[in-house]
């Protein structure tokens, strides 16, 4: 496994599956970010999985791996859990800048085209990357939450108690990426919450709206007034408890 990052998707798409497969003895997987140039390292490998590689140096590395592949016979799989072509990344997304260079689009496209398989998270992305890259060997592997991350917080009695306590004012929680908010006001708040912000404002006394890690800037006044509950970003270890 070659990771693109050590943040959220790096864990639940690469690191945690690798850990569990190794722990259960289902596979012997090594992971990291270093491009290993020793051909002997790849002897006996069945699969090399690369996550969201996009730079010219990474393309050259994959091309070199293709020459080693002829000798060793392993598969090369490209893992991607998001859209990385800039024409389809919203202007409000704070990470868009990382993919604005046309060369990034070209190199990531070429890498995906020469890989034996692409893995994605859902059918929409499967059809998207088939259409964009022409590589028809795209497999859907949904995101799965590992039990060791969340299971100790599942308590049926507590769930029933919470329901009784909050049923007069149900809690509605958003705990996704802050990239869905126009935090730099690039498009005048026309982000992923633009179409529901008015509903949230109008129902703030009917529902307890809860945001984790970020919130629509146009609702800042409700956050400051404590009418919307807000919890700051947290690390992956403490995230379930937060």
Language model: regions and residue ranges:
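Conserved catalytic-core segment of nucleotide-activated headgroup transferases in glycan assembly
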Residues: 5-20, 144-237
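Membrane-proximal helix-turn-helix segments that form the acceptor-binding/catalytic region
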Residues: 67, 71, 97-118
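An aromatic- and histidine-rich active-site surface loop
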Residues: 51-70, 79-80, 85-87, 187-189
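N-terminal pre-catalytic "stem/leader" segment of glycosyltransferase-like enzymes
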Residues: 1-55
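Carbohydrate-associated surface elements
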Residues: 124, 141-144
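Short, polar loop motifs at secondary-structure junctions
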Residues: 34-36, 122-126, 212-219
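Acceptor-binding helix/loop patch of EC 2.4 sugar-transfer enzymes
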Residues: 5, 78-105, 148-153, 166-168, ...
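Short acidic alpha-helix that forms the nucleotide-activated donor recognition element
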Residues: 113, 235-242
């Amino acid at each position: 496994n070659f990771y693109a990052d050590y943040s959220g998707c790096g864990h639940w798409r690469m690191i945690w599956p690798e850990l569990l497969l190794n722990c259960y003895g289902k596979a012997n997987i090594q992971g990291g970010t270093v491009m290993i140039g020793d051909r002997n390292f790849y002897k006996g490998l069945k699969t090399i999985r690369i996550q969201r590689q996009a730079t010219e140096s990474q393309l050259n590395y994959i091309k070199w791996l293709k020459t080693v592949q002829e000798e060793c016979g392993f598969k090369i799989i490209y893992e991607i859990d998001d859209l990385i072509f800039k024409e389809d990344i919203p202007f409000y997304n704070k990470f868009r800048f990382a993919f604005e260079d046309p060369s990034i689009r070209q190199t990531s496209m070429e890498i995906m085209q020469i890989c034996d398989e692409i893995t994605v998270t859902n059918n929409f992305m499967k059809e998207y990357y088939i259409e964009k890259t022409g590589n028809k060997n795209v497999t859907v592997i949904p995101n799965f939450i590992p039990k060791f991350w969340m299971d100790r917080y599942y308590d049926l009695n507590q769930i029933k108690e919470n329901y009784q306590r909050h049923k007069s004012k149900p809690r509605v929680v958003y705990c996704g990426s802050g990239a869905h908010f126009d935090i730099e006001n690039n498009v005048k708040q026309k982000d992923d919450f633009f179409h529901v912000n008015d509903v949230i404002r109008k129902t703030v006394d009917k529902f307890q709206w809860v945001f984790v890690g970020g919130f629509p800037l146009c609702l800042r006044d409700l956050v400051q007034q404590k009418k919307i509950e807000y919890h700051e970003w947290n690390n992956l270890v403490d995230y379930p408890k937060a």
